[in-house]
Amino acid sequence: MAKEKFERNKPHVNIGTIGHVDHGKTSLTAAITKVLAKTGGATFLAYDLIDKAPEERERGITISTSHVEYQTSNRHYAHVDCPGHADYVKNMITGAAQMDGAILVVSAADGPMPQTREHILLARQVGVPYIVVFLNKVDMLDDPELRELVEMEVRDLLKKYEFPGDDIPIIPGSALKALEGDTSDIGEPAILKLMEAVDSYIPTPQRATDKPFLMPVEDVFSISGRGTVATGRVERGIIKVGEEVEVVGLRPTQKTVVTGVEMFRKLLDQGMAGDNIGALVRGLKREDMERGQVLAKPGSITPHTKFKAQIYVLSKEEGGRHTPFFKGYRPQFYFRTTDVTGSVKLPENVEMVMPGDNIAIEVELITPVAMEKELRFAVREGGRTVGAGVVAEIIE
C-alpha cells in the first residue's frame, strides 16, 4: 500500500456518520473508503471491519468507536462511526470524537426515525456546526415523489433544531450499490457527489493556534526573586511574553501581564496550543490565583454559574450510580481542572434520571467558572465520575 500518500499537506477535518440504527451509517462509511480507494485516497475497509469497533474509555466511559481516515483531492478526513446508538450519545457528549461536521444518514425507505431526531438534537446541543445528508437506500423507492417527501421531512426536522434545513445538501444514493461497484447515479457517483458536498459545505475548522489564548491553571507557585508562576497546558491560542491576560473563574476577574513563559525550565518568547508551560504573571501573589481558574485573552471568556447542559449518566456497569437521582441533586461539576458543586434542575415532565440516561438539565453552580458553549465537564460525587456533560447554553 502506498503509505507516503498520507502527507499532512492538506487541511484536516474531523467528521462522522450519524443517524438511526440500520439506516446504513456503517455501509456508507465502508462505501466511502471503497470509492476513494480507487484514487488512492483511502484503504478500503469492509463493513465488518468497521462494525467491530474497539472499545475505548473516555473519562471512565466505555465507548465503541471506529476511526477511519481517507482523503479527497482537497482534504484529509478523520471519520468516526459508532456501532450502537448509546455509543453515539456518549461520543458526542464527551467530545471523545470532536466533529467539525457530520453526515446524517437517512433511509429513503423509512424516512426520519426517533434516533434521526435524537442525533440532530445532540448535534445541536454539543455544537456539531454543519450537517450534510446522505439519503440512503433510494433503490428501494420506485416513486420519485416519495423521495421528495422524505427529503422535505428531513429538511423540516433539521430546521426544527435550528440547522439551515433549506441550504443543507441532500445527496441521494445507495451505499450498498456503491459497495457492489454499481456505476449508475445512485452507486459510486453518489458517493463522490457526497464527498464533494462535504468538501465544499463543511468549512475547514479554525486551527487551535488561531483561536484566542486560553490556559487552564493547574498549579500556582511563588518563585523568590521572580514572582508568581501559573502552570498548565495551553488549550488554544498563543501567548507571547508581554501580553495582557485575564484570570477568570472562581473569583472576580483580574487582569495581569505575562512577563515570562517557561517550558522544560527554558525561557521562551511564547507558548502555544498543546504546550505545557509556566507563565510568570506580574503583580499577583500566589494566593491571588488557584487551580480551576483560567488565563485567557482579555474579553474572550467570562465566568458563569447558570447554564443548560446535555448530560450522559454513567450506567452501573461503567462504575456509575446504582440508583436514579431526582430534582435538587447536588453533585460536583468538574470543569477543566477543578470540581465545583452545583444543583440540578430537571425538565418539567421528568421526575428522575436513571443510570444510562441522556438528558437535558439546568445547573446552578455555587461559584462561577470560566465557561462557554460546548465546554465539556464531568459530573462527580466525591471524586468518582458518575456522568459526562457539555454546556449547551449559558443562562447567566
Curated annotation (Swiss-Prot):
Pfam families: GTP_EFTU, GTP_EFTU_D2, GTP_EFTU_D3
Renumbered residue ranges of the record's region G1: 19-26
One annotated Gene Ontology cellular component of this protein: cytosol
Signal sequence bounds: none
Any one GO molecular-function label of the UniProt entry: GTPase activity
Broad class of enzyme this protein falls into: hydrolase
Residues at which Mg(2+) binds: 26
Reaction(s) this enzyme catalyzes, per UniProt: GTP + H2O = GDP + phosphate + H(+)
Annotated segments matching region G4: 136-139
Region (G2): 60-64
Chain residues that bind GTP: 19-26, 81-85, 136-139
Sorted UniProt keywords: Cytoplasm, Elongation factor, GTP-binding, Hydrolase, Magnesium, Metal-binding, Nucleotide-binding, Protein biosynthesis
Domain tr-type G span(s) in chain numbering: 10-206
Region named G5: 174-176
E.C. numbers: 3.6.5.3
Chain intervals for the UniProt region annotation (G3): 81-84
Family as reported in the entry's similarity comment: Belongs to the TRAFAC class translation factor GTPase superfamily. Classic translation factor GTPase family. EF-Tu/EF-1A subfamily.
PANTHER family in the record: ELONGATION FACTOR TU, MITOCHONDRIAL (PTHR43721:SF22), ELONGATION FACTOR TU-RELATED (PTHR43721)
Free-text function comment from the UniProt entry: GTP hydrolase that promotes the GTP-dependent binding of aminoacyl-tRNA to the A-site of ribosomes during protein biosynthesis.
Subunit structure: Monomer.
Protein name: Elongation factor Tu 1
Native species: Myxococcus xanthus (strain DK1622)
